[in-house]
Amino acid sequence: MTVETQLNPTPPVNQQIYRILRRDIVHCLIAPGTPLSEKEVSVRFNVSRQPVREAFIKLAENGLIQIRPQRGSYVNKISMAQVRNGSFIRQAIECAVARRAASMITESQCYQLEQNLHQQRIAIERKQLDDFFELDDNFHQLLTQIADCQLAWDTIENLKATVDRVRYMSFDHVSPPEMLLRQHLDIFSALQKRDGDAVERAMTQHLQEISESVRQIRQENSDWFSEE
């Protein structure tokens, strides 16, 4: 039985459906290989099929689902190629962003990062993984704002969907939030010192964590992964 999900009346419906389905796929609430029905999703959100179809197209563009005309849609397995390429591109962008942010950061921006890190700590203490996941993203997005490069975050956001699935799966034991928070604190410390070399090293170490995580996660969930 499909449980209806209420949407906010203000933002575009297709964008809301996309965000909710993306979250469900990234959090593995909808597992790799699961069929997706336009009809069932439209019933879930109590909408016509058109906004659902538009959300499906965007999910496909992000590499999260496969749309096969006349054969239906399904959630893609986690592509090792996309994880490798997405991680490589993200590291190149974010290391450059971090170095630039170190030369531009203001005291008020330091305070913003400090508040974010405090909220991360609270989320960990309360075992609120979904909140930590969002705060982790917000931390990295703040760095692109400090570096005055919104395009960098837009690019990262478009390519990191597959990597996000590995990130979320790693929280349990491979890359626990406590360790990720320590790495965020190292990045913040280097930013406070305006040390471009140190912040780039800290960011590199932080982002390489996904490469270590994916090996173990794949061993434990081999049916969810593909080489393509």
Swiss-Prot record:
DNA-binding region extent: 38-57
GO MF terms held by the record: DNA binding; DNA-binding transcription factor activity
Name the Gene3D superfamilies for this protein: GntR ligand-binding domain-like, Winged helix-like DNA-binding domain superfamily/Winged helix DNA-binding domain
- HTH gntR-type domain location is 11-78
**Entry keywords, A to Z:** DNA-binding, Transcription, Transcription regulation
CDD domains in the record: WHTH_GntR (cd07377)
Task: Identify the Pfam families for this entry.
Answer: FCD, GntR
Name of the protein described by the UniProt record? Uncharacterized HTH-type transcriptional regulator YdfH
To which species is this protein native?
A: Escherichia coli O6:H1 (strain CFT073 / ATCC 700928 / UPEC)
Give the gene that encodes this protein.
ydfH
